[in-house]
Each structure stands twice: as C-alpha cells, then as structure tokens.
Amino acid sequence: MNGLGGVKKVVVIGLGMTGLSVVNFWLRQTGDRDIKVIDTRATPPGQDKLPSSVELCAGQWNMNWLLEADLIVASPGIALATPELVAAKAAGIEIVGDIELFARVVTKPVVAITGSNGKSTVTSLIGEMAKEAGINVGVGGNIGFAALDMLVNEHDLYVLELSSFQLETTSSLQLKAAVYLNLSEDHMDRYNGLEDYSLAKMRIFEHAELAVYNRDDLATFPVSFSHQITSFGFDNQDYGLVTLHGEEFLALDEQPIMKTSDIALVGRHNVANSLAALALADAVNIDRQAVCRALQRYNGLAHRCQLVVNQHDVKWVNDSKATNLASTLAALKGLNLPGKLHLLVGGDGKGADFSELKLVLADLNVQLYCFGRDGNQFMPLVDAPICIETMAQAMAIAADTAQKGDMILLSPACASFDQFPNFMARGDAFIEQAKALQPRVAGAKAC
C-alpha cells in the first residue's frame, strides 16, 4: 500500500501526542473513514482532545477492531512484538507508524537524524541553520511537533529526529540526507541486543540520497547502501577538523570553515554534533554563512547540560535528557571542577548495564546520589553512595552539604517514567527545586 487509497478502517494504537496527531491527520483527509483508537491505559493522555466521532477503547485491547482494520497505526512506544500486533500482522493487517504516514504524503525535501545521543541537538541545530537562511522549516518527529502536525501548514524543508522505535514502522521515507550519529546501549528492555537496536536505526538510510555516518563510531557505517556516502569525525577527512596557526577549525575536505572555539554549544561531543549538522545542511544547500551564524548563536536545548542556578559558588546543572549511560558519560567527560561533584543518578534503567561509569567516577571527586526505581544499580560504582527514594530528597541532601566550587548535576543515565511523565517534567522539577533550595546551600548560610 503506497498511499492512502483503499484505507477505510483505521485503528490507532496509543493516544498521547502522537496518537492524536494520527487521528487528526486522518480527519483531514478526504473520504469517509472509520477511525478507532485503542489505548491500554485506563485514562489515556489526550483523551479529552479526542473528537467525539472517534471511538476509543481504553484499558484493554480490542482484537475485533484490530482484525477488521485496513491499516493499524502504532505509536512508537508500542513494540511490534506485542502479541496483539503479532496476531494482527499474521492476519495480513498492515502496521505502520506516524512517520510512514508522513512519508506517503510529504512533497518537500526531508532530512533526518538518528543515533543514541545528540539527536535532539543536531535536529534543532539544523532547524536553526535553516531559519537563519530564511527557509520555512518544520522541525519535529521525536522532538517538539509530531511529524503529521507539521503538515497542517506546509514547509519548504522538514528536519526529523527519528528514534529506533519510529524507524521500526517506517519503510518508504524518502530523504535528501540522513545521519546516524552514534550507537550506545539503550532500550535493551525492547531489543534482543545492541545489534538488534542498531539494525532498527540503520533503517534511516533505506531511501536516503546521502548517508552520513560517524567515522569515530563505525557501527554507524551504512554497510548495504548504494547511494552517496559521507562522514564526520575528529580527523581531517570529509567533515572533520583541521588546525591552522594553533587554532582548530571545522572543515570539509581539509578546507577550514569556522573555528571550533566560535561554536556556542559547549563540549567536545557538540563539536561532533556541529559537524553532523553541517553535513546535512550542505545536503539541502543551506547558505554556508547562515550555517556559521547559527553555530555561533545556538547554545542548546533545555535539559541538556543546562546551567540553571549559579549562586554561592555552587552550580546546579540540569541534564535530565541524559536518559542513558552514554549521555551521562558525555556529560562527565572533561569535567574539571575546583570542588566536589554531587551527581544525581537513577530512574528507569531500561535494563542497561551501568558498570562503565565506575572507571569514570573513580577519577572524579564525587558524591553519588542514587534515586528512583533502579537507583540501587548504581550503588556498587562508588564508595559511600547515598541511596534515597526521590530526586527531591537527593537534592535536599546535596544542598545541605555542597560547598563553594561544587557542582550539583542531574545526569540520571535513566528514563524518568518511574516517577515523572517524561524527562522534561523531571528537569523542570529539578530547576524549580534548585531555586527553592538556595537558602540551604552552605555559601548562603555563611552570609
């Protein structure tokens, strides 16, 4: 099925932002269709926004609906291995995701980004580059706007962040360029191993005109790809780095573009992210001067190594977006603090192995605070960890003990779903409490 013709009965699995975008997409199409929604949650988010013409089955599956459907549209959080979906597929029912619907109707150029870490930063950065060049750009997918909602007002360019979950149900997305940033262990509760997880991400290259991979992470190399390939990395090939007169530059084929010291984003990992964004920007002919201006101005997204309070010589940093081990390792890399690091970790560990943190923490003056459902998994990593139920409790203890020169860093290495709706809510809670706790910080009490 290459378009929307012939689809009369649609069943949407999972409500929330994505599910609602799918429902609204179908309601905008011409022709009569029977649209139903199944959500196994008793009170699905977004239920109050569901049009009365759309029937909802909440709190359970409805196999009759599934088996009578012409098309099932599954939200990314619903695994294709779910028995009910396996049964529907075996009965010959096509199962797609919202990105596949987007792919079947979009008419403007699209670039896409996947990877274990850095997706949101690179996606947003390319969006800023396009805006700086005066391009009417839509930025979304796994970040910000649902992809289908961006079609309400047509754009001249679309930039999509795509998760492995979204790519599993996408088969015909035509891309001007796609980048696979990096691979690290994540979502091991959903995949049979790292190779299985990577194969899902590799689907981003299937219909791309240009594949961009990370030379410093060869797991991202598009092995079975017959179109144009380029790469980014920290050596001087393709999109890389060169040094001239003691200054390091972003470069293409050893030709300097701009100083890395002029990039507004902080951290070595963001130099790599800038190179990846540069490659995709070139693929859709975004003006190079606009690209450089965006790199000089864009200082990142909320919840990603975000300095939220710096008072009494104690820094509070919100890295709630660090929902896996690799993100936390990136945050810790290169830290050089005059005082102690108070590191808050824990939440929903998603079946990950956190032992790699042990060597990194051994080189830091660190007090570890372990909270949430899987916080106890971090306890063997350091001597004298503090294990406590909630992030708020950990923050209160850190505030009472922090001294001048210390940093209190939320970089949990875990998802938030055990105690928060999402990482943004966790980060917002951290920011709110960090501000409220200022009177308890040692520097404040000494005044």
UniProtKB/Swiss-Prot annotation:
According to its UniProt record, this protein's enzyme class is ligase
Q: Where in the cell is it found?
A: Cytoplasm
Keyword Cell inner membrane (UniProt): no
Q: Which InterPro entries match?
A: Mur-like_cat_sf (IPR036565), Mur_ligase_C (IPR004101), Mur_ligase_C_dom_sf (IPR036615), Mur_ligase_cen (IPR013221), MurD (IPR005762)
Its GO biological process annotations read: cell division; cell wall organization; peptidoglycan biosynthetic process; regulation of cell shape
Q: Name its pathway.
A: Cell wall biogenesis; peptidoglycan biosynthesis
Enzyme Commission number(s): 6.3.2.9
The entry sums up its family as follows:
Belongs to the MurCDEF family.
Spell out the protein name for this chain. Answer: UDP-N-acetylmuramoylalanine--D-glutamate ligase
Species this protein is from: Photobacterium profundum (strain SS9)
Q: Coding gene?
A: murD
